Structure formats: C-alpha cells, structure tokens
From Swiss-Prot:
Coiled coil: none
Organism lineage: Bacteria, Pseudomonadati, Pseudomonadota, Alphaproteobacteria, Rickettsiales
Keyword ATP-binding assigned: yes
Top-level taxon in the UniProt lineage: Bacteria
Documented EC number(s): 6.3.5.-
Keywords for the protein's UniProt record, in alphabetical order: ATP-binding, Ligase, Nucleotide-binding, Protein biosynthesis
Protein name according to UniProt: Aspartyl/glutamyl-tRNA(Asn/Gln) amidotransferase subunit B
GO MF annotation, one: asparaginyl-tRNA synthase (glutamine-hydrolyzing) activity
GO terms under biological process: glutaminyl-tRNAGln biosynthesis via transamidation; translation
Length: 486
C-alpha cells in the first residue's frame, strides 16, 4: 500500500474505477452504422444515432455475446435477465436527451481481477458489475471561439462499463488494474483497448482516509484516457484532498476534470446521484433473456487468458515469473513468442525478445505487429545462437539488420559476409600470434595479473573482426597461456 504523506500523519487512498470499454463490433449497439475509427465527422450516423423522430433501436446480438464473453473473462456472474434503462440528462453530444444503459438489472455482476501490488504480492480487485450502454457523441470546443462542434460518429457505439469495488489502494495499483483488464479484453477480442483512440476510457472515484477510519467523501475524475494521466490525476487529487482535510476543510463531492498540461484537477460539476438521472426501463427495448446453453457455449470458446498463460509459461516452459508476466501481458507478443518457440529454445527466445527485440522496438516506438521481423526469421536467429553457429555479438548485429530490412538472418549473413570462425585450429593460430606479439603481457599474466585475460580476448577479437567463437577463444586461450614458454 502507498500512503499519502500529510503534514502530520499518513493517509490512505481509496480508489474505485469505472472502465468504459468500446465493444469490438462492426456495427453500433442499436443501429447498423459503422464503428470504424477515424472517419470524417458525422459520416457514420444513422437516424437513430441522431435521435430522429420515429427511429427505433434494434439490439445488436453480437454485442451482447461480446459482453457475456467479457463477463466470463473477469469471473462475473451472468444474469439471465437484464433490462435496458434510459439515463436522462442533457448534453449537446447526446441528441436523444437520454442514454440507453442498464441500471437496475445489468447483464453481469460480481467478478474479480488479480493484480500484483507494490510488493509483488497478488491482490484481488473485486468487480461490482458489468453493464452494456451506448456511447455518446464527441464535442469539440477548441476549433472556434464562438461555436462548439459535435461529431456523432461515436454516438451509439456499444460500451461495456466495468465498475470495480473501491479495493484499489494506490495510483500504481490503479495502473496495474487497467493494464490487466486491457490485456484480458484484448485476449478475448471484445475490445481493442486502444486508449489513444478512445476505445478504453476511465472515470476514477477517489477519497482519502486515515488508516482504519471511515471512508471519506469521494470525488470522480472523468474521462481519463491514458494510464499515465490516471496515475498523475490520482496522485494530485489524493494530495489535494489531504491538504483540504488537514487545513480543517471538508472535501466537496463533485465531478472533476484532469488537465494533463498543468497536472491538476478542476471542478466540472457537482456529482450527481442516481435519482438525478431519473432511470426507468426503456419502453422500446424488450428485456434480454439468456439461455444457459448460450452462456455455456460462449464459455467453452474462451481463449487462454493472461493468468493461465503465465502459469503455463512458468510451470511447463520454465520461464522466470518476470519473463512470463511480461510476455503474457500483451496478446500479440505472446502469439509471436509461441510461434517462435515451436522451433526454437523457449528460454533463449524469451531473453532475446525481452532484451534485444524490445530495445529496438521501444527505440522506434513500434509494436510487434509493426515490426518487420517475422516469427520464422526470429526463430532462425535463435537457432543459430543456440547451436553456437554465431556469437551473441554477431547475432545482435544481424538482429538490427533484420529489424531494419525484414530479411532473414541467413540472407543478411550472406550479403554482409558474416561468418563465425569456429575452427579450433584457426583460432589457435591467431591466439599464438597474439601471445607472441604481447610477450611482456603474457609474463605479467603468468605472474598473477589475471585481469589481462580479457586483454588477450580483445586482441583475438580484434584480429578476427569480432567473428571468432567466444567460447572457443576462452577455452583455447586458457590452455595456450598455461603452455606458453617464457
């Protein structure tokens, strides 16, 4: 647990998150309009999305299946009866004057997600509910001094709102929770999790309290769209509330916005209660009634999720806990890894992905899907390393060329005339020349200056342009130094 340092004592964070995940579907929740991201404004809008009189909602069954799959993936209980309600409020990007949501009877309740806390211990974050609702349109206020612009392309896209219990005790835990939930959504293929495209957004409820005391007054930080912003917003807001309480004030229950440039939260409006929205069942939509056979069928099709994959990597492949967690955290990385190890050593593969390949990808800011290196070519490189056909130094050079060109390692080695010297006789002759040229250093080595061994290795590498087999160099050099006549 991370504490907030006040002037006189420590305070605890109490955090609950509401995650809004866009359901991965070609059509919207109640209309057949496209959900493709990046289209020109208001080009993917049907009559219902603009709330034209007489237009009626028709439920997209696929979105319901996606929500069931997600609920099962987070260990939630599926409700066989769920009902859509109207959430009434006015805003310019909500043309109907209400949002179709699920308040009284959500599609799923309960569930949990396990994360690692600051000490590396497993912590279970309880889920309160998962419900289906419409997304709103998007308002833009910075393109004109006199007008705001409305884009309804997003209006009506299916959302899953996943509400956690206030079990999160620090901004770091909040970040881990979102990363884990996003990974699960991507494995399930129910949401792409792209926060930069608005497919995953977060509202954070936060209060502070002294250890073992009653819960404080919570504030809600709205529309956080990156993990970095979530952490910064929670850190600032926690400290703000502590400062108010320690100065004798009271925290006002309100909705806040986070300014990422200033790193501060600002009041948006007083926080509403459920009664303010005047929820009532939508008269245009029948209840969702689910058969157990449908739920069982969806459950049987669930893929292996991150926690199960980590367990398999550790127990069967014998990866370290850390390597297993990093590889399993990203669905695409995991798929790449598993394709490579069909023909290559898994532990060596994991080490090279996490160190060398990640280093190149991070430098260029690309994902594994944008990387030119194929799984087959990477496997070929790992096989060359494990068979000692090339040294690690040569392999790093080849990998960089693979990364830049997309060519196979063997083609690169042919084009660059890269070939490891692995002939013991050839290496022995080179070592003889090095020792003769550095007679005085050999004398010093034999008199106890063991550190000179690295100097001799460097001289051999220099003569071979780094292409000699390092293990053979070490083995033969040890023998030659013992036998050298002084």
């Amino acid at each position: 647990m991370t504490f907030i340092e006040g002037k006189t004592e420590k305070w605890e964070y109490v955090i609950g998150l509401e995650i809004h995940a866009q359901i991965k579907s070609n059509a919207k929740l109640f209309s057949s309009a496209s959900t493709e991201f990046g289209s020109s404004p208001n080009s993917q809008v049907e009559l219902l999305d603009a709330a034209m009189p007489g237009s009626l909602p028709v439920l997209n069954e696929f979105c319901v299946h996606q929500a069931i799959k997600t609920a099962l993936g987070i260990n939630a209980k599926i409700n066989k009866l769920s009902i859509f309600d109207r959430k009434n409020y006015f805003y310019a990007d909500l043309p109907a004057g209400y949002q179709i949501s699920q308040f009284y009877h959500p599609i799923a309740q309960g569930g949990w997600i396990e994360i690692l806390d600051e000490n590396g211990n497993i912590k279970c974050i309880q889920i309160n509910r998962l419900h289906i609702e419409q997304d709103t349109g998007k308002s833009t206020h910075d393109q004109s001094d006199t007008y705001s612009y409305i884009d309804l392309n997003r209006s009506g896209i299916a959302l899953m709102e996943i509400v956690s219990e206030p079990d999160i005790s620090s901004p770091m835990q909040a970040a881990e929770y979102i990363k884990k939930l996003r990974a699960i959504l991507r494995y399930l293929d129910s949401c792409n999790g792209d926060m930069e495209k608005g497919a995953l957004r977060c509202d954070a409820n936060i209060s502070v309290r002294k250890p073992n005391s009653e819960l404080g007054t919570k504030c809600e930080i709205k529309n956080l769209n990156s993990i970095k912003s979530i952490v910064r917003a929670l850190e600032f807001e926690g400290q703000r509330q502590v400062n108010i309480l320690e100065s004798g004030g009271t925290v006002k229950q309100e909705s806040l916005l986070f300014d990422a440039t200033l790193g501060k939260t600002f009041p948006m409006r007083s926080k509403e209660n459920a009664t303010d929205y005047r929820y009532f069942p939508d008269p245009d939509l029948p209840p969702i009634i689910l058969d157990q056979s449908l739920i069982d069928n969806i459950a049987s099709s669930l893929p292996e999720l991150p926690d199960a994959k980590i367990t398999r990597y550790v127990n069967e492949i014998k990866l370290s806990d850390y390597n297993a967690q990093v590889l399993a955290a990203d669905k695409d990385i995991s798929c790449f890894f598993e394709e490579v190890i069909k023909t290559a050593n898994p532990i060596l593969t994991a080490n090279w992905i996490l160190s060398e390949l990640f280093g190149l990808m991070n430098k260029d800011g690309i994902t594994i899907n944008e990387c030119k290196i194929t799984a087959n070519h990477f496997s070929e490189l790992i096989q060359l390393i494990s068979s000692k056909a090339i040294s690690s130094k040569i392999a790093k050079t080849v990998l960089k060329e693979m990364f830049d060109s997309g060519k196979s390692p063997k083609i690169i080695m042919q084009e660059k005339n890269i070939q490891q010297i692995s002939d013991p006789n050839q290496i022995a002759d080179i070592i003889d020349d090095v020792l003769k040229d550095n007679y005085q250093s050999v004398v010093s080595y034999r008199n106890g200056k063991d550190r000179l061994f690295g100097f001799f290795v460097g001289q051999v590498m220099k003569k071979t342009a780094g292409n000699a087999n390092p293990e053979l160099i070490n083995e033969i050099l040890h023998t030659k130094l013992k036998q050298f006549q002084i």
